[in-house]
């Protein structure tokens, strides 16, 4: 199952790591909307390997976000199937949703807190109830390093630039250590230099942190 192979030996159930990351496959994703039954997804088949960084590119209204929502399992009103390492996502969504991260186009952060405070309160919600303060602090340090915001940890969110706020939103989702990571137009409104920096960070996450990353962009 996902990164593990279950082996039953007499009275013991063993778990063996067999792969890193999550591979995603779509089979015949199809969706129609409206009274005219306009086709938004037309039997989409694709395969994304584990730890790949993939961009879904297209113009406005092309169905990019619709496809991503179908891939993530959050849109149930889609024909076809999605498999994560061979496991049907729709049939096992409640068990698999914890490994899925999603960053919407609108930043998901509280602007009247410092970055560290915001991450701390978010960690209290996202991490298990028995997580210690030391473990939370260690996780915050880790995600700050991942998104290259360590030097801004005591900065109020409202004083951050657009690119920094986007990285803060990504840090929020990284607290739960998702293996499959979706981002909706993360570079929207960013200048070319900031966009390049963000793309470099995302590429690094996929290569060094065992994350499969799928983003939507124009």
List the predicted regions and their residue ranges:
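The feature captures the beta-strand-to-loop junction immediately N-terminal to the Walker
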Residues: 57-60
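Helix-to-loop junction immediately C-terminal to a conserved catalytic motif
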Residues: 72
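ABC ATPase NBD Q-loop/coupling interface
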Residues: 81-95
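Q-loop/switch helix immediately C-terminal to the Walker
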Residues: 111-128, 139
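Conserved ABC ATPase "signature" region
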Residues: 120, 135-152
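Hydrophobic anchor residue at the start of the ABC signature
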Residues: 170, 198
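ABC ATPase C-loop
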Residues: 173-174
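Catalytic Walker B motif of ABC-type/P-loop ATPase nucleotide-binding domains
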Residues: 181-184
């Amino acid at each position: 199952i996902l990164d593990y192979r279950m082996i039953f030996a007499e009275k013991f159930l063993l778990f063996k790591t067999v792969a890193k990351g999550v591979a995603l496959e779509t089979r015949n994703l199809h969706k129609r909307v409206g009274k005219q039954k306009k086709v938004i997804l037309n039997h989409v088949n694709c395969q994304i390997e584990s730890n790949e960084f993939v961009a879904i590119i297209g113009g406005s209204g092309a169905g990019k976000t619709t496809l991503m929502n179908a891939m993530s399992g959050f849109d149930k009103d889609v024909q076809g199937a999605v498999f994560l390492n061979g496991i049907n996502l729709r049939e096992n969504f409640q068990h698999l949703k914890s490994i899925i991260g999603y960053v919407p186009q609108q930043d998901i952060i509280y602007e009247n807190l410092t970055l560290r405070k915001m991450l701390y309160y978010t960690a209290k919600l996202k991490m298990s109830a028995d997580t210690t303060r030391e473990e939370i602090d260690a996780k915050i340090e880790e995600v700050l390093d991942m998104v290259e915001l360590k030097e801004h940890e005591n900065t109020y969110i409202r004083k951050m630039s657009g690119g920094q706020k986007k990285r803060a939103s990504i840090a929020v989702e990284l607290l739960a250590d998702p293996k499959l990571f979706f981002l909706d137009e993360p570079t929207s409104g960013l200048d070319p230099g900031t966009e390049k920096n963000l793309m470099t960070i995302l590429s690094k996450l996929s290569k060094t942190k065992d994350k499969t990353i799928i983003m939507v962009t124009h």
